[in-house]
Every structure is written in C-alpha cells, then in structure tokens.
Amino acid sequence: GIYIKQSVTNLIQKENSIEISLGNKKINFDKIIVSAGAWSNKIANMVGDKFPLDTERGYHILFETNEKLINRPVAWSESGFYLIQIHDGIRAAGTVEIAGLNKSPNSRRIAMIERQSRKVLPQLGNVKSTWMGRRPTLPDSLPIIGKSQKNNNVIYAFGHQHIGWTLGAVTGKIIDSLSRDHI
C-alpha cells in the first residue's frame, strides 16, 4: 500500500476499484482506508455513507518560561484544563466545545485558559503561541472502525475523540486484518 496525505477532490466507485482525484491527479486503488480524523465525513459522503461526525475543539496556550515552575502535570478541574511543563515552556491545554470544522476559533476560550492559568501560576511568562485542535467525535463516543456498508473496498478508522493515541495501535491491527480480508 501507499500513504498519501493530500486533499481528495473526488471519488469514483468502479466495479473492482476506487478512483480518487487528488487535484488534477487520478489514482485507482483496490481498497482505501479513510482515516482523516474530523475530515473523514467528506470522503464517507462521497462513498454514500452518512455518519453523525462532529468536531470537539480543544485549545492550547504555550507560555514562555526560563525556569522550571512545575515538575508534574497540574490539573484545575474547576476550569477544565491542565498545565504541563514541556521543553520550550508551560503548556495550558483543555476545555472542549462541539463547534464543527469551519467555525472560527473561540478567542474567549483562549482568554479564559490564560486568565485561569495565571491564577494558578502568576509567574507565567508571555504567551508564546496558541492553537486549537479538532478531535473527531460521534454522539455515542464510539469510533467508526470497519468496512463501509456501501462499498466493501472502503474501510473506515476515525472518530476516536480523546483516545486516538490510546486506540491507534489496536485500530491499526483491526484495519490491517480488514484490508487483507482476514476479518
């Protein structure tokens, strides 16, 4: 198999293969694995499958620091975030909102995390960077792992929410078996 990280612009289902358009390039595959996280529904819809996939958005702030202020992760459950010392500063991460793929980041969430972080550690430095991550989520919290109901040559592996790293290896083994028709 091959791994391609590029936007799929079209998908044509043929009798024994799937043709994927990547911009101007078209490639035929015997099977495809859709593991595009929060963007997986775009391809699933091209196949004809519909999933209630949404996006959990989590926010992160990296604070500058010239000294080690904490020696273990610090959780503040009241505000729903953690502070973690990493090599280039202190990361504050947390909070979750269901807001889809296209909505702009919520600056109030970043401001709240910064404000609450400074309550816990007033000696935090300047904000070095901020970012927002998008986790694929489904209403029942269960990931989509398995063959498409519309096309046996399409295999899905997405929707792991907060446990993608934890379930990644197990999902990989299942997908490997499915792709070889061992399951």
Task: Briefly describe each language-model feature range.
Residues 17, 27, 31-152:
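Active-site substrate-recognition segment that forms the wall
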Residues 11, 61-63, 157:
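Short beta-strand element of the conserved SAM-dependent methyltransferase core
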Residues 4, 33, 155-157:
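Hydrophobic/aromatic beta-strand patches that form the interior of the parallel beta-sheet core
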Residues 4-18:
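A conserved short coil-to-beta-strand element within the FAD-binding core of flavoproteins
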Residues 20-22, 159:
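Short beta-strand segments that buttress and anchor functional surface loops
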